[in-house]
Amino acid sequence: EKSHLSFSVKMRLGWEDKEEWKPVLDLLNNIPLKQITLHPRIGTQQYKGKVDMESFDAFYNTCKHSLIYNGDLTTIEDIHRIENSYPKLAGIMIGRGLLARPTLSAEYASGKEYSEAERRNLLHAMHDRLIAHYETTANSEAQIHSRMRLFWEYMETEIGRKVYKKIMKAGNLKNYLNAVREI
């Protein structure tokens, strides 16, 4: 009996070597997959250094499946660059870029980059909704504080180093909220 499920693969170029993808893709090209998402780095690199666009280009030209690009997309320009360079892509995955700039997908969809003031206002609105949710689900102010600090983990560039450090060093919810008001 056939299953209604489809399978996708998310992968990097390799673990230690940027050529490790080649024999893997030979196998993947011969099995039924919905899509492949490629992050063009090697595993040992984690998120350090640059993505390897030369290797992505080779993968793109060899892959027989629908392909999704993933890696280092933090601006609308980054998205357009990938979109224009690889017109046969099935999609683009935004990971840490969206965590660092939560308005990025909305900016892309609207076709315009938001002003700093617009981004800050939307960031505060999102933050306030999240705080309100945690106030109804968390057991204590300490839990709310702990969870909310994670909200800012990738946003240092967006909010500035000084206020980011204040948020991270805030020892309790009151000090945390005071630091957030400085954004």
Positions of predicted regions on the chain:
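Flavin-dependent oxidoreductase catalytic cores
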Residues: 1-183
